Amino acid sequence: MKNSCASRELSVGELARRAGVAVSALHFYETKGLISSQRNAGNQRRFSRETLRRVVVIKVAQRVGIPLAEIARALQTLPAGRSPSAADWARLSAQWKEDLTERIDKLLLLRDQLDGCIGCGCLSLQACPLRNPGDQLSAEGPGAHWLDAEGREHDG
């Protein structure tokens, strides 16, 4: 007999099915403190209905590349005992948009710097610590320094 009461709790299987995640993902989220459950008399996990929306927030955030540690920090700012509201989502997504924009900008810069290495191929350009950080021979300029012009080994 199904309980139609809006406040009823969800089993781990129900929550997994409704959220579109594996049961193991819910267990993982719980061990990371992203969601919580109560145990019933039979020692089975029971999740509040609000947890469904939290899992959806986790999934969306993960899909756009937000690290779980960031998601956990964000979820800690939400009040317990209620589903995240539209205002909660607006606040979280605004912060995540800022972070994503910053990461995208960094990735675009890295991509553009990487293009400069294609012609050289030696990965010892002194202009870019990304390509070869701490290069001992970078003071001698770009290019391979252990080979002479004909490609023979050279005593450094």
UniProtKB/Swiss-Prot annotation:
Q: Which CDD domains match?
A: HTH_SoxR (cd01110)
One GO BP on record is: response to oxidative stress
Membrane spanning segments where? none
One Pfam match, given by its short name, reads MerR-DNA-bind
What molecular function terms (GO) are annotated for this protein?
2 iron, 2 sulfur cluster binding; DNA binding; DNA-binding transcription factor activity; metal ion binding
Query: Which key words are in the record?
Result: 2Fe-2S, Activator, DNA-binding, Iron, Iron-sulfur, Metal-binding, Transcription, Transcription regulation
Q: Where does [2Fe-2S] cluster bind?
A: C117, C120, C122, C128
Q: Give the span(s) annotated as Might be part of a sensor region.
A: 117-128
Q: InterPro entries attached here?
A: DNA-bd_dom_put_sf, MerR-type_HTH_dom, MerR_fam, Redox-sen_tscrpt-act_SoxR, Tscrpt_reg_MerR_DNA-bd
DNA-binding region(s), residue ranges: 12-31
What residue stretches are annotated with the HTH merR-type domain? 9-77
Q: How does it assemble?
A: Homodimer.
Q: Briefly, what is this protein's role?
A: Activates the transcription of the soxS gene which itself controls the superoxide response regulon. SoxR contains a 2Fe-2S iron-sulfur cluster that may act as a redox sensor system that recognizes superoxide. The variable redox state of the Fe-S cluster is employed in vivo to modulate the transcriptional activity of SoxR in response to specific types of oxidative stress.
* Record's protein name: Redox-sensitive transcriptional activator SoxR
Gene that encodes it: soxR
